[in-house]
């Protein structure tokens, strides 16, 4: 269980509350969550050990054109990991719903409105693109590169989070490898609803024991934290216990409410230019 579930900054969230669905544009529906809540718990200061983005895909984006004809698109939002706030996902959904019966003059006006409002909520400039559905005609479902660590014949009896599974997990020769798991599951900090994801860990350093890494990832199964916070916890725990020279942690979560969240954290300064779906997305 997260130590900050009862933080005063979370008290006013619509998440977990009965809410009305507004179909007229209303930017005030967006709700920020300070990233400092979990970063204080991780002993992270202002100088972060990573860069990256939260990559959101907006599958239920619809509005009316100037003549009242409904329009649909798929949107992508890239929210910098350096922003003071993350955006709470239910409030994001409610905000997008408020476009549904609102007339806009152009697609560019939609993109500009999203960019302005999300930047204000996050506290730092975000990148927004919206695309027509036909742009996705030939887009394939992909799998993460590298080796999957899930097919191990091990017995697990505890599903409570424990970073100590990573103790002494990195030994031996220096390697560069990509590992991934589809068994990442945590729970919403407020509602306890399950969050399902796949995670890729790319690193250069002493080789990480795959059994210990898998046990660590499975220990998130009863853990309560937002998607972005889980990924930052994975990054900082691996850096603490395994001390790789280079590390990237990239998780892609299944969608909820027409949104998926794909946090990316790295100390290599690179971010993915694409946003390809995995099988469960």
From Swiss-Prot:
Pathway(s) annotated for this protein in UniProt: tRNA modification; tRNA-queuosine biosynthesis
Molecular-function GO terms, alphabetical: preQ1 synthase activity
Reactions catalysed according to its record: 7-aminomethyl-7-carbaguanine + 2 NADP(+) = 7-cyano-7-deazaguanine + 2 NADPH + 3 H(+)
A family per Pfam: QueF
Cellular localisation: Cytoplasm
Superkingdom of the organism of origin: Bacteria
Chief location of this protein within or outside the cell: cytoplasm
GO biological process, one term: tRNA modification
Protein's UniProt keywords contain RNA-binding: no
InterPro entries given in the database record: GTP-CH-I_C/QueF, NADPH_dep_7-cyano-7-deazaG_red, QueF, QueF_N, QueF_type2
EC number annotated for this UniProt entry: 1.7.1.13
SUPFAM superfamilies linked to this entry: Tetrahydrobiopterin biosynthesis enzymes-like
Record: residues binding substrate: 87-89, 227-228
Gene Ontology cellular-component annotations: cytoplasm
Keywords from the named record: Cytoplasm, NADP, Oxidoreductase, Queuosine biosynthesis
Residue numbers binding NADPH: 89-90, 256-257
The keyword tRNA processing appears for this protein: no
Residues annotated as catalytic: 188, 195
Protein purpose: Catalyzes the NADPH-dependent reduction of 7-cyano-7-deazaguanine (preQ0) to 7-aminomethyl-7-deazaguanine (preQ1).
HAMAP family, sorted: QueF_type2
SUBUNIT field: Homodimer.
Protein name in UniProt: NADPH-dependent 7-cyano-7-deazaguanine reductase
Gene name linked to the record: queF
């Amino acid at each position: 269980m997260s130590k900050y579930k009862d933080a005063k900054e979370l008290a006013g969230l619509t998440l977990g509350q009965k809410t009305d669905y507004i179909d007229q544009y209303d930017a005030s529906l967006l709700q920020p969550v300070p990233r400092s809540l979990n970063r204080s718990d991780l002993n992270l200061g202002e100088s972060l050990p990573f860069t990256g983005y939260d990559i959101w895909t907006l599958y239920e984006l619809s509005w009316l054109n100037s003549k009242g004809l409904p329009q649909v698109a798929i949107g992508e939002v890239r929210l910098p990991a350096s922003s003071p706030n993350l955006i709470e996902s239910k409030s994001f959904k409610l905000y997008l719903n408020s476009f549904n019966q609102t007339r806009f003059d152009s697609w560019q006006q939609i993109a500009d409105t999203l960019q302005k409002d999300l930047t204000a909520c996050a506290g730092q400039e975000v990148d927004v693109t919206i695309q027509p559905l036909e742009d996705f005609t030939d887009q394939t479902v992909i799998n993460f590169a590298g080796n999957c660590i899930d097919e191990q014949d091990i017995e697990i009896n505890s599903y409570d989070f424990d970073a100590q599974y990573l103790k002494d997990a990195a030994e031996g020769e220096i390697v560069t490898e990509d590992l991934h798991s589809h068994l990442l599951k945590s729970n919403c900090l407020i509602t306890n609803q399950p969050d399902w994801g796949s995670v890729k860990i790319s690193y250069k350093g002493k080789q990480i024991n795959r059994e210990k890494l898998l046990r660590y990832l499975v220990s998130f199964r009863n853990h309560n934290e937002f998607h972005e916070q889980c990924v930052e916890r994975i990054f900082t725990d691996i850096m603490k216990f395994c001390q790789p020279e280079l590390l990237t942690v990239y998780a892609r979560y299944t969608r909820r409410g027409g949104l998926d969240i794909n946090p990316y954290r790295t100390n290599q300064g690179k971010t993915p230019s694409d946003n390809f779906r995995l099988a469960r997305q």
